Amino acid sequence: MSNKVHVKKGDTVVLLTGEGKEAGKKGKVLEVNTKDGTVIVEGMNIVKKHQKPRSQYQQGGIINKEAPIHASNVMLVCPKCGKPTKVRRRILENGEKIRECKKCNGTIDVIREAKK
């Protein structure tokens, strides 16, 4: 069962909660997991992974990587007004489905093209 997530890959989001210094930071969504309702944001929630060498030629060590964040802890930043906002989905008269900013009513992007 997949859950609807209000952000897409490539969106700019702001972190609402986090480890003190990370709250309020902006980043780009790298990956969305609808099954778990989580997102991976560039430069946020960095964890250290201890990795063993898998082959004779690969080097092991400690790797920094982004960990998933629950989608409820991020908010989309509107590309038009630049403010964190909730997302409204709307179907226009011509059948086009869009994502819209609730603060400035600007179109964020088109989800589905108009039916011909």
Curated annotation (Swiss-Prot):
Origin superkingdom: Bacteria
A GO molecular-function descriptor: rRNA binding
Transcription regulation in keyword set: no
Keyword annotations: Ribonucleoprotein, Ribosomal protein, RNA-binding, rRNA-binding
InterPro entries attached to this UniProt entry: Rib_uL2_dom2 (IPR014722), Ribosomal_uL24 (IPR003256), Ribosomal_uL24_KOW (IPR041988), Translation_prot_SH3-like_sf (IPR008991)
GO terms, biological process: translation
Any one annotated GO CC term: ribonucleoprotein complex
Function: One of two assembly initiator proteins, it binds directly to the 5'-end of the 23S rRNA, where it nucleates assembly of the 50S subunit.
Family: Belongs to the universal ribosomal protein uL24 family.
Subunit architecture: Part of the 50S ribosomal subunit.
Protein name: Large ribosomal subunit protein uL24
Organism expressing this protein natively: Acetivibrio thermocellus (strain ATCC 27405 / DSM 1237 / JCM 9322 / NBRC 103400 / NCIMB 10682 / NRRL B-4536 / VPI 7372) (Clostridium thermocellum)
